Amino acid sequence: MNIEEVALKYALANAVKYGGKADVKAVMAKIMAEVPELRPRAREVKEVVEAVVARVNAMSLEEQRRLLEEKWPEALEEKRPEQKRPGIEALPDLPKVKGGVVVRFAPNPDFVLHLGSARPAILNYAYRLKYGGRFILRFEDTDPRTKRPLVTEEVNAYEAIREDLRWLGVSWDEEYIQSRRMEVYYDYAKRLLAMGAAYVDLCRPEEWRRLRNEGRACPHRSQSPEENLELWDKMLEGRFREGEAVVRIKTDLSHPDPSVRDWVAFRIIDTSKTPHPLVGDKYIVWPTYNFAVSIDDHLMGVTHVLRAQEHSVNTVKQSYVFKHFGWEQPVTIHFGRLKIEGATLSKSKLKALKVRYDDPTLPTLAGLRARGILPEAIWELILTVGIKPSDSTVALSNLFALNRKKIEPVANRYMYVADPVRLVFEADRELVAKVPYHPSFRERGERVYRLGPGRVEVFVQRQDVKEGAVVRLMELANVEIERVEGGVAYGRLHSLSLEEARKIGAPIIQWVVDPVEVRVVRPWAPGRKVEEVGLGEAVLRGVEVGAYAQFFRYGFVKKIGPDVFIYVHD
């Protein structure tokens, strides 16, 4: 067996999957798992792997993929079992699909994902599942000044986004981080400058805006490629300060949208003042969104781009880069804006709340996860809205309704009393209550409560007891409230049957005996929640953390700690 060939295969596969950089440990683990007979030679194998990984990492991503396709095309095939998702086949067909699609989800890691950003992630991945191909995760983080990536002691947005996608059930075939591809962008910038398709502009911003609005060229547009390349080198050397020089793509100065006219491809950002969390102050000349996206979509072989309608002008801007290089632009599908009634999706507003990103009051994916929303409910919501070009408005209650359908079968029923008062009455016989854990799944069993004969004491909710009224204690008996004194209600046994309660219109209320104190966290508004203390059945102590339950006449909850539940929805 040729160890070097085995190492090359897995190093190339690892590098292609993770943006061009193979990892020695990952390659070693793969080799030992796939070729166990090499385990006794681990030290020898590691030396070979280290040398091969170094050689592979020196290649461009395009070279890595080409070599892998030539020698081991099967290594590029998708091997993970693919989940069948209801609704995927109902999505409208994409145009110009040839065998499979290459799609991408490209978040800016200046914040974590929320319900709105789940839409492009799910839709792109859904088409990847529908047609086969590749799904790319690309972090677009080339603005360390105004859209600085969020990396703090509390949260690393890069990892948080990965975690959110895994929770959603979205897995990626390749991953890229744009801030680690700066040399690639520099290379293509030089090519455009040498072609005369771009130029270095030294105009003052206000002068440029005046010329642009008049549809006139700035003086630097006619510079020779040699002059532009010299100015480009000076930009890289730090000879210009912020705002003194930019690189512009030559477009159409008469374009009806002034923002399309010779848009900025590179600008200077003083990273000594605003260092990038991943690459520090290594670079001061940074590509703009539209330039980096154009280069990456081509080099990564993206075939279809699904994104929000607000990006339509960006598609126009990017078309000029594709035209200058003679590349085919990906098929682009723009879908309408998704508005969620009852949820704030603005990053700036969410940041201003100054609460943890996984706070259950927030519509972030981490917040929804903490609250008890299932990823399957989010999938169903997004696939129902689909990729229609018109704007859509969906109430947060729609998501709750979908989630309710999914947790209802697994959520056992329990009695819980908020704002409790003691109810005392005399029983002339033994009263027996059999409370099933789930009315639709009787095989799960029931709790049996035996009270009386004699004095009976239970706890009920304060608002349920009114003098002179008859109430039905669920599964137990009908009691007439005679008087209420302070925190105690006194009553008498009225009757036993449910039929009698219905006949006289007695409300059915919850009650607990020998209870445990239960705390319920209720999300109230973004950044605001209240904690309610009540009494619950003692069997709630046995509910596992993470399990769902339904409190009768209250709503669905999820256990998050000893005797602590979070309110999910009604």
UniProtKB/Swiss-Prot annotation:
EC class (word) = ligase
Q: Which UniProt keywords apply?
A: Aminoacyl-tRNA synthetase, ATP-binding, Cytoplasm, Ligase, Nucleotide-binding, Protein biosynthesis
> Which reaction is recorded as catalysed by this protein?
tRNA(Glu) + L-glutamate + ATP = L-glutamyl-tRNA(Glu) + AMP + diphosphate
GO CC aspect terms: cytosol
E.C. number(s) listed in UniProt: 6.1.1.17
The keyword Transmembrane helix appears for this protein: no
The organism's superkingdom is given as: Archaea
A Pfam entry, by short name = tRNA-synt_1c_C
A single GO molecular-function term is: ATP binding
Transmembrane segments annotated in the record for this chain: none
Q: Where does the record place it? A: Cytoplasm
> Main localization of the protein?
cytoplasm
'HIGH' region, short sequence motif: residues: 107-117
Question: Does this entry carry the keyword Cytoplasm?
Answer: yes
Q: Which InterPro entries match?
A: Gln/Glu-tRNA_Ligase (IPR050132), Glu-tRNA-synth_arc/euk (IPR004526), Glu/Gln-tRNA-synth (IPR000924), Glu/Gln-tRNA-synth_Ib_cat-dom (IPR020058), Glu/Gln-tRNA-synth_Ib_codon-bd (IPR020059), Rbsml_bL25/Gln-tRNA_synth_N (IPR020056), Ribosomal_bL25/Gln-tRNA_synth (IPR011035), Rossmann-like_a/b/a_fold (IPR014729)
GO BP terms in the entry:
amide biosynthetic process; glutamyl-tRNA aminoacylation
- PANTHER family reported in the protein's UniProt record: GLUTAMATE--TRNA LIGASE, GLUTAMINE-TRNA LIGASE
What does the similarity note say? Belongs to the class-I aminoacyl-tRNA synthetase family. Glutamate--tRNA ligase type 2 subfamily.
NCBIfam families attached to this UniProt entry: gltX_arch (TIGR00463), PRK04156.1 (NF003169)
Function per UniProt: Catalyzes the attachment of glutamate to tRNA(Glu) in a two-step reaction: glutamate is first activated by ATP to form Glu-AMP and then transferred to the acceptor end of tRNA(Glu).
Give the protein's recorded name. Glutamate--tRNA ligase
* Protein species of origin: Pyrobaculum calidifontis (strain DSM 21063 / JCM 11548 / VA1)
Q: What lineage, starting at the top, does this entry show? A: Archaea, Thermoproteota, Thermoprotei, Thermoproteales, Thermoproteaceae
